[in-house]
């Protein structure tokens, strides 16, 4: 009996030890002496910020747990000043998250390479993005290595380079952003969804086999998607509220905060006004909305007089909400085709005028105009958010003053007899009745 109890105790101990061991021995938490910690605390602040925005920390932790890595870090001014503004804006758009990740992984090798290994012969090494970097004469892809062995750690090394390395796939994605080949017969997709609890990308569901019952309910399939844009707002729905407008409004406000640069807009929608609740109610009723969101720099230019009047924040925001579903492509195609477009706004009866200017969409008139420069921040088929660089105000019509002059009094002319009748009456006297 004692042998049996010892055997059972040994089995239970073995099972508990097995379950306590991690599945991947190299996927534990990194220590303070890791090359990733050195990168985040280094003077390469622009690169570290891009790594955090691209949600690559978890991926790099797993890579460091398996092998050493080599990071080629561009200088801060190469990312801040010497980079094309349009290309940088393209990388920071949520829908281009994959391109940003590929660009950053192109700077990382899954092995340790020190400066003595930079030979004069041409050598190629595979990166974490499955592309190749070519080394020759102290250069990597024709970019000079300015600070070799700048930061050295047990699990990796960081070399400083003079400029950003751009893989061909990312360059092609950037060049196709306005070509017909990238937008013809292609269903627009929303930005990648990020789980707010873990700050990681939500995984796409597995493909549904043929004949399987639908995963989404019918009312989700009924909602008009981006392929129908531009489309007028549908009529109000019934009392069942098939569309969860409050959840969609929360998603787009969370996207504004995560995108960065639109905190003032989100603060007005949630805290200063009740517009977020009103928008959620409209979407629940079946309406679609397009929000022209001014960035923080534009909101900072508002004066105290413009915001101090009762209801001023609501009226300003109402003018930036269009009761239609419009994407950047649909707006740009409309103004290219028709010249000027006047969109209805929730600030009735004022309309928002749009026209094509400098390869983009321009809203408003004169000094109060604004350009669309952050396209498709959030597009889910019912709410579309487009970033603009100014706050719009409706055009004030100046009343035409009527000229007031001295009224001219017209006197009625007295009836006058003809000259011939006067002469005849004078000669013959006033005997005839006509001379009376």
Curated annotation (Swiss-Prot):
Belongs to the fasciclin-like AGP family. GO terms for cellular component: extracellular region. Glycans are attached at residues 68, 271. This is Fasciclin-like arabinogalactan protein 15. SUPFAM superfamilies: FAS1 domain. Keywords: Glycoprotein, Proteoglycan, Repeat, Secreted, Signal. Transmembrane segments: none annotated. Its main location: secreted. May be a cell surface adhesion protein. The lineage of its organism: Eukaryota, Viridiplantae, Streptophyta, Embryophyta, Tracheophyta. It comes from Arabidopsis thaliana. Residues 1-20 form the signal peptide. Residues 31-165, 249-392 form the FAS1 domain. InterPro entries: FAS1_dom_sf, FAS1_domain, FLA15/16/17/18. It is found in: Secreted. It comes from the Eukaryota.
């Amino acid at each position: 009996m004692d042998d049996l109890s010892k055997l059972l105790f040994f089995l239970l101990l073995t099972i508990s030890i097995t379950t306590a061991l991690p599945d991947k021995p190299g996927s534990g938490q990194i220590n303070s002496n890791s090359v990733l910690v050195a990168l985040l605390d280094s003077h390469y602040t622009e690169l570290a910020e891009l790594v955090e925005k691209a949600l690559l920390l978890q991926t790099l932790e797993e890579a460091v747990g398996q092998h050493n890595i080599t990071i080629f870090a561009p200088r801060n001014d190469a990312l801040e000043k010497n980079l094309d503004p349009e290309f940088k804006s393209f990388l920071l758009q949520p829908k281009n998250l994959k391109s940003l990740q590929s660009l950053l992984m192109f700077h990382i090798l899954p092995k340790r390479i020190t400066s003595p290994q930079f030979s004069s012969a041409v050598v190629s090494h595979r990166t974490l993005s499955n592309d190749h970097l070519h080394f020759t004469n102290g250069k990597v892809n024709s970019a000079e290595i300015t600070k070799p062995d700048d930061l050295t750690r047990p699990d990796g090394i960081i070399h400083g380079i003079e400029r950003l390395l751009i893989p061909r796939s990312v360059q092609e994605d950037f060049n196709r952003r306005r070509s017909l080949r990238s937008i013809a017969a292609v269903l627009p997709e929303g930005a990648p969804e990020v789980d707010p609890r873990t700050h990681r990308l939500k995984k796409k569901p597995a493909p549904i086999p043929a004949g399987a019952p639908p995963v989404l309910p019918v009312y989700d399939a009924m909602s008009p998607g981006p392929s129908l844009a531009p489309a007028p707002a549908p009529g109000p729905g019934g009392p069942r509220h098939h569309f969860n407008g409050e959840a969609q409004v929360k998603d787009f406000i969370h996207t504004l905060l995560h995108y960065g640069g639109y905190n003032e807009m989100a603060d007005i929608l949630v805290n200063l006004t009740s517009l977020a609740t009103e928008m959620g109610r409209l979407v629940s009723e079946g309406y679609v909305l397009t929000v022209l969101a001014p960035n923080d720099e534009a909101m900072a230019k508002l004066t105290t007089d413009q915001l101090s009047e009762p209801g001023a924040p609501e009226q300003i925001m109402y003018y930036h909400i269009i009761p239609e579903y419009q994407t950047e492509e649909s707006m740009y195609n409309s103004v290219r085709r028709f010249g000027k477009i006047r969109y209805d706004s929730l600030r009735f009866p004022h309309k928002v005028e749009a026209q094509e200017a400098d390869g983009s969409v321009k809203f408003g008139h004169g000094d109060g105009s604004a350009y669309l420069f952050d396209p498709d921040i959030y597009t889910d088929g019912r709410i579309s958010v487009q970033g603009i660089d100014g706050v719009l105000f409706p055009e004030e019509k100046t009343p035409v003053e009527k000229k007031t002059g001295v009224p001219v009094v017209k006197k009625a002319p007295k009836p006058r007899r003809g000259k011939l009748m006067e002469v005849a009456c004078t000669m013959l006297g006033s005997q005839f009745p006509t001379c009376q």
